[in-house]
Amino acid sequence: MTMAGGRRGLVAPQNTFLENIVRRSNDTNFVLGNAQIVDWPIVYSNDGFCKLSGYHRAEVMQKSSACSFMYGELTDKDTVEKVRQTFENYEMNSFEILMYKKNRTPVWFFVKIAPIRNEQDKVVLFLCTFSDITAFKQPIEDDSCKGWGKFARLTRALTSSRGVLQQLAPSVQKGENVHKHSRLAEVLQLGSDILPQYKQEAPKTPPHIILHYCVFKTTWDWIILILTFYTAILVPYNVSFKTRQNNVAWLVVDSIVDVIFLVDIVLNFHTTFVGPAGEVISDPKLIRMNYLKTWFVIDLLSCLPYDVINAFENVDEGISSLFSSLKVVRLLRLGRVARKLDHYIEYGAAVLVLLVCVFGLAAHWMACIWYSIGDYEIFDEDTKTIRNNSWLYQLALDIGTPYQFNGSGSGKWEGGPSKNSVYISSLYFTMTSLTSVGFGNIAPSTDIEKIFAVAIMMIGSLLYATIFGNVTTIFQQMYANTNRYHEMLNSVRDFLKLYQVPKGLSERVMDYIVSTWSMSRGIDTEKVLQICPKDMRADICVHLNRKVFKEHPAFRLASDGCLRALAMEFQTVHCAPGDLIYHAGESVDSLCFVVSGSLEVIQDDEVVAILGKGDVFGDVFWKEATLAQSCANVRALTYCDLHVIKRDALQKVLEFYTAFSHSFSRNLILTYNLRKRIVFRKISDVKREEEERMKRKNEAPLILPPDHPVRRLFQRFRQQKEARLAAERGGRDLDDLDVEKGNALTDHTSANHSLVKASVVTVRESPATPVSFQAASTSTVSDHAKLHAPGSECLGPKAGGGDPAKRKGWARFKDACGKGEDWNKVSKAESMETLPERTKASGEATLKKTDSCDSGITKSDLRLDNVGEARSPQDRSPILAEVKHSFYPIPEQTLQATVLEVKHELKEDIKALNAKMTSIEKQLSEILRILMSRGSSQSPQDTCEVSRPQSPESDRDIFGAS
């Protein structure tokens, strides 16, 4: 007996896209690619494509659906571009292209590309089919093939490519005998409207197929049940009481019943049924074959119109009696009740009604037999006498309708009780006998009557005890699993109601329980295996996992002991549509083999692989030392059966069977490795980035009003910069005057003391303070005095040169220009001969960044003001070498050294200013964003353009290029 919910089959919504494509393929070679990821990676390839290309399924997964990995030097570039355009435009198209197998053998393919849409009419997949047309692209006349060899090659090519031949030659004459080709090719030729969609949907049936659990079929089954009981009652009555259907009304009713049963036969040829695995079978061919092998013959015999023959007037009595007896065959209609009993017992009240009807039907049949026995024994045809001990004779005397012999007429006994009285009396006797009551007013007297009475008592006691005495016990024994199933369902329903589980999740839970029960029939496999001994348990496990061991080449070299050890560790998992086998981020501790159904692998909300029968997913535990984290979700599309083995159990077996471990590691190829994350870019993301880039490119520049605070702030920066430049120009004019007038510097400095006091306001964290140039101007006089006295005491080794060292870089540059006049007196050749070598130790005085000063400019251990003090006499100037050298170096070299030193110092200052300005610009942009958000109500006409302040780096020294 099947479970209560099992007669409906597995009817949850499923994504049967892969099954539909495989069913329609008919040996077509195809791949499926994701249309939402860049390069359209392959998510599924059937065995035909793998055989045709020479690649394993795991090798082509995540490769481009355009099959660029099969391109070669002879592949046409224009065709490749057309293929790419077809993918980019989501079009349907076909091409002839030369590609290469894995062994680099060139093959001509006829490629068809078709987009697959989901329920939102969005293209999510590409279906690409491949047909080998090499035989039609190569010339028949080949020098290497002569005679019969050439003919054999052509014949072999034609016989192996019948489907391709029909596709390439659609104009076939009507009278020609053509072979049936792939239905998938027909689908692709008709258009994308009839292509299967990639979505979850309830199981669909063909238009002329009726679901066995629909309302119409359920109502029809109850009508058939009622008519079956009608037949079971009238057929025995008509046969026993020998009634001819002379009444037209009864004849019409019986004929209508026969027609209804004939219609039921026709409906059975178009009604789905539940397969052995719990699936709903809707294939018309399978339905017809199943019905022909089971109940068709019995139903046909029970529907023959036997009453039509008896309705004729001039029918021989023997023939009429024969056909009346054949009416008993109609009792075979009770088989309809037997095979659909599980449909009716779903309803509690129907069970009690059926049991009472069965008891009454048994009493009716016994009453008909009881009357037949009395009617057979009451008359003696040989002696034309009546037996006084028959129960019919006693009944006739009791009710006052005795039998009388008509000697002048028919010569037969006439009279006696009516048929209604006889039937009621017979039913009364059988009911009292079946219930063991027996009042004795009707009693058997002949031997046959007594034997039948004994049989009635035995049958009655059995029926009474079975149906009425032990109904509860019998039901508990017969439907123990069903009761447990209902108990489990009630517990689950109460749990879901108690914890207020969402409706969608509740439906998934209930569907999973129903489907799991349908597969296991409520049998606890682990409990059964525990009863069996170890050897028998291992044999059972090998049988349960035989599909995995036979389909995968990794187990071919395993010994019997190894297979038994592996089989003991395998577990069978049943998954309902929508179940997640792995969540992204959780540990991958199992290796899963797909036995039936299909699954999808989802990474970043995109389908990166579709797994079907024969695929393997998980992790390569035998090659990795650490436990992996799943990089994707694995979700069931249909009802799936997975054979799973844990990581620790597999490693334990592989460690023990070392020889098998090498073969297993080499031959087992994962269809999808959950440890590895696929790096891809979505086409939608690429398009969105391109749109944003174009939007930024076409945006109008930001315009601010003239009185905006940011514009006033930048105006203040410009004023400060102009003041600083004016001060620097004043300093340069003062230094030029020093060079020209020599000792008159002191008077000129005093006269222009106010100009030297000019301040430069710099941007810094603290309030601005003036930076005076007075120190630089006062030190200029002493430097020039020393330049005009080269042989003085300052050239000695103890001369520290403190005053020149305190000058700024620009002032020291002017000093070098003044010294150049004296250096010109030294000949170039003499200077080159006696130029002392500088020590490397004293020449590597680099600047290091230290704490920030008030102006925000980084300072160094060697301040620009004190750079001269930190250098040796040889580094400061060649003229400060040892006293024994009475000559000076070439003025061009000294000038270049001084310029480079000044350039380095200025560059450091400019870098510091740039860093500070960058920080200020970031803060100003944040201020601007806040102000713009608050002042968004301003009109666009009141704004003006904001220009970035000129970077200090743009005002480089004219010597920066050197």
From Swiss-Prot:
<keyword id="KW-0812">Transmembrane</keyword>
<comment type="subunit">
    <text>Homomultimer. The potassium channel is composed of a homo- or heterotetrameric complex of pore-forming alpha subunits that can associate with modulating beta subunits. Heteromultimer with KCNH5/EAG2. Interacts with ALG10B. Interacts with RABEP1. Interacts (via C-terminus) with CTTN. Interacts (via cytoplasmic region) with Ca(2+)-bound calmodulin.</text>
</comment>
<feature type="compositionally biased region" description="Polar residues">
    <location>
        <begin position="934"/>
        <end position="952"/>
    </location>
</feature>
<dbReference type="GO" id="GO:0030425">
    <property type="term" value="C:dendrite"/>
</dbReference>
<dbReference type="GO" id="GO:0034705">
    <property type="term" value="C:potassium channel complex"/>
</dbReference>
<keyword id="KW-0406">Ion transport</keyword>
<dbReference type="GO" id="GO:0071277">
    <property type="term" value="P:cellular response to calcium ion"/>
</dbReference>
<keyword id="KW-0630">Potassium</keyword>
<dbReference type="GO" id="GO:0042802">
    <property type="term" value="F:identical protein binding"/>
</dbReference>
<feature type="topological domain" description="Extracellular">
    <location>
        <begin position="373"/>
        <end position="421"/>
    </location>
</feature>
<keyword id="KW-0966">Cell projection</keyword>
<dbReference type="GO" id="GO:0098688">
    <property type="term" value="C:parallel fiber to Purkinje cell synapse"/>
</dbReference>
<protein>
    <recommendedName>
        <fullName>Voltage-gated delayed rectifier potassium channel KCNH1</fullName>
    </recommendedName>
</protein>
<dbReference type="InterPro" id="IPR000595">
    <property type="entry name" value="cNMP-bd_dom"/>
</dbReference>
<dbReference type="GO" id="GO:2000300">
    <property type="term" value="P:regulation of synaptic vesicle exocytosis"/>
</dbReference>
<feature type="topological domain" description="Cytoplasmic">
    <location>
        <begin position="1"/>
        <end position="220"/>
    </location>
</feature>
<keyword id="KW-0770">Synapse</keyword>
<feature type="region of interest" description="CAD (involved in subunit assembly)">
    <location>
        <begin position="897"/>
        <end position="937"/>
    </location>
</feature>
<dbReference type="InterPro" id="IPR003938">
    <property type="entry name" value="K_chnl_volt-dep_EAG/ELK/ERG"/>
</dbReference>
<dbReference type="Pfam" id="PF00027">
    <property type="entry name" value="cNMP_binding"/>
</dbReference>
<feature type="transmembrane region" description="Helical; Voltage-sensor; Name=Segment S4">
    <location>
        <begin position="319"/>
        <end position="341"/>
    </location>
</feature>
<dbReference type="GO" id="GO:0006813">
    <property type="term" value="P:potassium ion transport"/>
</dbReference>
<keyword id="KW-0967">Endosome</keyword>
<feature type="transmembrane region" description="Helical; Name=Segment S1">
    <location>
        <begin position="221"/>
        <end position="241"/>
    </location>
</feature>
<dbReference type="InterPro" id="IPR001610">
    <property type="entry name" value="PAC"/>
</dbReference>
<feature type="topological domain" description="Extracellular">
    <location>
        <begin position="444"/>
        <end position="450"/>
    </location>
</feature>
<dbReference type="GO" id="GO:0099509">
    <property type="term" value="P:regulation of presynaptic cytosolic calcium ion concentration"/>
</dbReference>
<dbReference type="InterPro" id="IPR005821">
    <property type="entry name" value="Ion_trans_dom"/>
</dbReference>
<keyword id="KW-0813">Transport</keyword>
<feature type="transmembrane region" description="Helical; Name=Segment S6">
    <location>
        <begin position="451"/>
        <end position="471"/>
    </location>
</feature>
<dbReference type="GO" id="GO:0005251">
    <property type="term" value="F:delayed rectifier potassium channel activity"/>
</dbReference>
<dbReference type="InterPro" id="IPR035965">
    <property type="entry name" value="PAS-like_dom_sf"/>
</dbReference>
<feature type="region of interest" description="Disordered">
    <location>
        <begin position="933"/>
        <end position="962"/>
    </location>
</feature>
<comment type="function">
    <text>Pore-forming (alpha) subunit of a voltage-gated delayed rectifier potassium channel that mediates outward-rectifying potassium currents which, on depolarization, reaches a steady-state level and do not inactivate. The activation kinetics depend on the prepulse potential and external divalent cation concentration. With negative prepulses, the current activation is delayed and slowed down several fold, whereas more positive prepulses speed up activation. The time course of activation is biphasic with a fast and a slowly activating current component.</text>
</comment>
<keyword id="KW-0597">Phosphoprotein</keyword>
<feature type="glycosylation site" description="N-linked (GlcNAc...) asparagine">
    <location>
        <position position="406"/>
    </location>
</feature>
<dbReference type="InterPro" id="IPR000014">
    <property type="entry name" value="PAS"/>
</dbReference>
<feature type="compositionally biased region" description="Basic and acidic residues">
    <location>
        <begin position="830"/>
        <end position="852"/>
    </location>
</feature>
<feature type="domain" description="PAC">
    <location>
        <begin position="93"/>
        <end position="145"/>
    </location>
</feature>
<dbReference type="GO" id="GO:0042734">
    <property type="term" value="C:presynaptic membrane"/>
</dbReference>
<feature type="region of interest" description="Disordered">
    <location>
        <begin position="830"/>
        <end position="859"/>
    </location>
</feature>
<dbReference type="GO" id="GO:0042391">
    <property type="term" value="P:regulation of membrane potential"/>
</dbReference>
